[in-house]
């Protein structure tokens, strides 16, 4: 087992900087596209054998130092009773967004092993195949709540923020229910064999720091506290969260994921003693080889004083990224960071 990723998460010395990429199992890989040509996205997410195949692809093809479970953060919302659709070209849709207490009351807190047993089976199967650590994950309550309230993706989050400020009790009720379900979901993943867990807060950066502290952070803290019994690295990724960095560090996470909008060395000085993950702009993978290697070298140099660095993108890899560019990045990180 190559445990370089786990060592970096714990802030231990490593022979080189480990790398994996958010959304590394996905649309940019021809092998993934071939599978998706036969099944819908939701069908794929619920098929353990296919999920195993997709999860393994970037590890086998590109040499990643960790695998991340192939799934989606909104699978849990469907298990809670929210009708979920994935429409080509417009992403996830909840046709019945939560607008009132009646809709909230209709959501359930499912038994994770029962309602999302296909996820746990995928984890168990992967542990028998992988020679690198397996990362499980869930969406942070705030990010998941935005989808339930907006009915899908949003650019301005009008419905979410309107509810926060005009119906705070309803908003907190939604967050409470999602939090309880997420705790059970991630605990089940840990029991199934996940070796690290990441909490994706894709939309945290739309919040003012004072609102993040009230409406989002307390729920993340509760989730992380509930996972301490498993002694696994917990990664918290708050996208566009440079203004939230110190508060994110108080979440209890072992590792903070960074987007590309902050210098990783500066981040390390602001939150000393915590491992950091990131943080090249996903579009920088399109650079010519020499310029990409130079960009990677700069990030590695900036991160030299960070106590534990996992190289990653600042967000998910873009679907039109040539796989060979991802391979160049993996090789560059390994070569340039070799101690």
From Swiss-Prot:
- Cellular compartments per GO CC: cytosol
Q: Where is this site: Transition state stabilizer?
A: 72
Please indicate which superkingdom the organism of origin belongs to.
Answer: Bacteria
Q: Which Pfam families match?
A: URO-D
A GO BP entry = protoporphyrinogen IX biosynthetic process
Q: Which UniProt keywords apply?
A: Cytoplasm, Decarboxylase, Lyase, Porphyrin biosynthesis
Quote the subunit structure annotation: Homodimer.
**HAMAP family in the record, alphabetically?**
URO_D (MF_00218)
> Mind telling me what this protein is named?
Uroporphyrinogen decarboxylase
**What organism, scientifically named, is this protein from?**
Desulfotalea psychrophila (strain LSv54 / DSM 12343)
